[in-house]
Amino acid sequence: MTRIAKERGTDNVLADLGLPDAEELTAKAILAKKINDIIESRGLTQSAAAKRLKIPQPKVSAIRTYKLTGISLERLMQALTALGQHVEIIVRPCDRNTPARINVAA
């Protein structure tokens, strides 16, 4: 029987794929997911969401389909506040044995 070597990944599949901006992409996807959940729960059309978020409808479409190139983390956070969400950023020292990272919880 042949043994197959397994390589342990991280908790970020985008980093495991070697993407240089994996943490930012993951953060954007998490924020977009929260925005999409709110849009769906409120039954908003893309047009209605665009008015509420004060962004063009094509940007809402991009968020809805997770095509987040050209949409900043700041813009996503502003969208969440426009939807009545509190966005909090906490900076704290990391443990000695753990590399520093960006983490988003939504």
Where are the regions a protein language model picked out?
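Short alpha-helical DNA-recognition segment
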Residues: G43-S61
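Short secondary-structure boundary/hinge segments and terminal tails
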Residues: Q57, L68, N97-T98
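Short, solvent-exposed alpha-helical "recognition" segments
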Residues: K67-L73
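DNA major-groove recognition helix of helix-turn-helix
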Residues: R64
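DNA major-groove recognition helix of helix-turn-helix/homeodomain DNA-binding modules
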Residues: L73-I90
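N-terminal flexible/basic segments that precede or flank functional cores
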Residues: M1-K33, C94-V104
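Short amphipathic helical patch at the helix-1/turn junction of helix-turn-helix
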Residues: I39-S41
